[in-house]
């Protein structure tokens, strides 16, 4: 058995957990709450991730715990803020499979007031007229409704009978009472924009039509829904969080787990895009539909829920959130963020090694906007993107670095506990500030470049470059971790200190010095996730049934999300492992790797080690397959043909290489601006798990590309990027 949800009862110091067992039964469990803290103590028997001694205090009484915190308030405390629910889940459910959840998809329709119009969620003065739910564990689509006064009861009943499981009620109160009974065995309730509409509206109407005490029927453990104010896209709103029975807004799930931007997130647009299905169309207003065509009104409401159910049947986003929650021992709503789930994953990894993690650093949400455009303080330099060389290019190849940021963190053993020191970025800060200054152009003051734009052309801090160039005349200041007084050295002295002193140290492109005499918790966790994902991908490949393929695919995707989320969490001040130095070390070292990759590729082709050389037309991570036609001295052939004709072959790193020195290929000599035939270095092939698409143009030319390949298309006079699956007949392809 595994958990669905949990709450902390602070009055009784108990953690209440609700489970769903393998037979589909709901089971309630209680655990004593564990309040734990550690404090610095030279004689302590426990060890932090920094390898320093601490002493543990644990109590099942919150009052005793608070008292102990005050006693040790003059000392550094550790883990004093770890959520007792997560601590309970880690202890009791860490290796337990996620349960099969009872899912309920929901959509409501509300009445219209001729004077006041439709009601807002904070004052739901209009009654709910219809509710449709899909109870996935039963496979039933059920509608409850109050018919319009324009119909007799007999006429309305005759219409309702044309649908399966559709029931009419004389009053809204009777209908809502039936709704609460229908959802009683649901674990998760989900709708489209249900956070912003359905849930708060239902809460408001249940309180008015029935009684406030009936709101407890939305929750478990006799709890009441909890009001929560939130802001999204600059607009403030409110909703309610239900307890024990989890609510997940499917629109927000879709936005979170779909990595491409959509032109519209309306249910109709997403249903058409994902399923080829749409909402029921009607003329006039929904109120007119309700009163004038009750049949289509019911059909409209039911179709919305069908779309939701069909979307989840295809996308499985709730199952994905369920796996993520249980893989990291957090609650389902926690997966909608990025910080808390990453925090707990790292905590679990540290605890496996018997190590203690720090408490969170205090910060103000109002003072930090890490992704804001107006405030650049606290932001890290972003990724390097090469300027595209505009035009049509033939024989384009691509190199894709696997998991660049996670691999960079692992390569330099980056973690808060492995930082030795930081070269003060005095020159870099001055340079960036100067670049960002507003400038007077003619008689007009022009706003300076953004923080990101100011980093253009830089692949590391100026201090890092000085060290790597061993500049004797450049003085640098190092702030050492745990040492109050900084030291001053010349850049060449820093190089020798890092690389020739016998210390197991490394230097990031941010000028951060890391140690590697032991593996950091975060690099170790990333290595584990990466290796585990490879195993899961292999099991998916070996699976023979549709169910097994979906099972292993879901699990490997969890690891992918974990890998990709960790870097962003480290740059978020709300993360207990937040450290700007690690974030910028990751991006700048990633830039340096990309620079070397581009330079080396250009050197292989042109002989010049130059990152923006003639052979580099763009920086991207996609790949193109082997069917492009190549002109050779033996005639036109595909890359695959060229590989097959190789008379010199070898294997390396899971790839097969071939070469034939008797065949020359045609390429452009950019110095002479003329085509010429020369020998090629080699052709290699390797297995890929990505889907392939054949793109055929109007002249009959064909090119095979992978599913994640970006194709530039002209649409309405604009250049846009499409994936192969998004192409339609008639698209004007500018470049592949």
Question: Residue locations for each model-derived region?
Answer:
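Conserved DEDDh/DEDDy metal-dependent 3′-5′ exonuclease domain
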Residues: 144-262
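Conserved catalytic palm subdomain of right-hand nucleotidyl-transferase polymerases, strongest
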Residues: 106, 248-249, 391-404, 530-533
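Acidic, Mg2+-coordinating catalytic module of metal-dependent nucleases/exonucleases
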Residues: 184-202, 207, 250-342
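A short acidic-Thr-Gly-centered motif at the start of a beta-strand
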Residues: 91-99, 381-395, 608-609, 630, ...
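HINT superfamily self-processing domains
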Residues: 623-736
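Common nucleic-acid-contacting/processivity interface regions adjacent to the catalytic cores
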Residues: 288-424, 428-442, 548-600, 605, ...
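Conserved RNase H-like, two-metal-ion catalytic cores of nucleic-acid enzymes
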Residues: 8, 14-19, 24-42, 86, ...
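Helical catalytic core of nucleic-acid polymerases
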Residues: 401-612, 623
